[in-house]
Amino acid sequence: MSKFRTHIGIILAMILAVSPLAVYSATAATGGPKDAVITLQSPFLDASNTSEAKSNQQMADGWVAKGWFGTGLVFQVSFAPVGSTINLTYNVKDKNGKPLAFTRVNLRINKGYSEAASIVEVDGVRTKGIDRPPFDQANVIRLTDAFGNITFALKNLDLESSAEPEPDSFTSKPIFSDDKLDRLHSQMLPEVSSEPADHSVITEFHYFKPKAPIVVPATKPTITLVSPKLDATNSVLDAGKNLKQAYAPLGGDLVVVYKVTGDDGRAVPSKVVDLKVNGGKSTLKATTDAFGYAAFTVKNADTKPNSAPASATSAMPAASSAFATLVPEITGTTAAVAEGVEFHYYRGISSSVAKSGKDFVVSVAIAGAAGKTASVAVTGAKKASVKLSSAMQVVPVKVKAGAKTVTVVIDGKSYTSKVVAK
């Protein structure tokens, strides 16, 4: 490879159906926050299912040493059947490990210098399979969710006659001739700010023609939650329901991804997964990809939010006014494991302050009020009326030093917080 620069009636859900914000561009920097740490959540790749893991990572380390990419760059090469779909799910955090929620991510598809000749499609945006560096073949921009997650369905559209031979294993070298004319691969790089400012991951897939149909028995499948990654720092466990519970801003999209493995522990491709919402009052459907991952994007449209929790691990409200309980299942099977998850939706504010020259900036984060108009008042600053377009929107307010009371009014209800600028 060359150098390459609830209530159920009002819970709406979509399966990978959020419209992209922009498509097709060159390699211009995305311009988001610097030092974003971007990791691949699905498919999960490591030395057991990638080609020449050690040498490829050494290559990536060399690109970092040259200053082309930010530190921590990961480069992995794997395989997928020609004509298959791969659900690429990424998690984005800042350098301190805090999720970068509702942040623009540019998926650079068959990026410049990738030498990729595959025809792939994301959100209806299709590559031409012609590498013309420094230009990417396609770009799709989406927003991360409240947990910093984002997912893209990468569909390969090449003919079987164009595919590479199936490798002996996923740790083998891709099989193609020295002139590379029969090589068929795609290559993706998610970007938040720029190549040097991000700490990202480049993933390359070689498309092969299977020697035989891929069939994985799954009479007792294991269906595990991959995204969001919930633990003791961002969720609580309801032992009675045997599921994890987490808070999310009202009105925001959530990426929910499951991994399905069969009776022998292998990934189950092309299997429909039903996601039962609130006891089966509604059902969402998604099909597992080439690596056994089913990806859902769930959109909340409740109108009566819960109060903001004191922390992400606060007990869930006894009588929640906005929630969604999600449980996966596969028709005709009895799951050995089926991990459910429950989200409780809230509205509230938080404030932080930072030095800006001789003055300070109070950042007022308003959660769960997309589509609303908020009155924002901070001690010593002029009151502002702000139209909110995101489920988590930050309003910057310039102030002088001193103690500040932040008051936000939405639909006649006041939300307050206090900070000290010093």
Regions found by a protein language model. Name each.
Residues 19-422:
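The feature marks long extracellular or luminal low-complexity segments
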Residues 1-11:
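Bacterial N-terminal signal peptides that target proteins for export
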Residues 11-20:
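Bacterial N-terminal signal peptides
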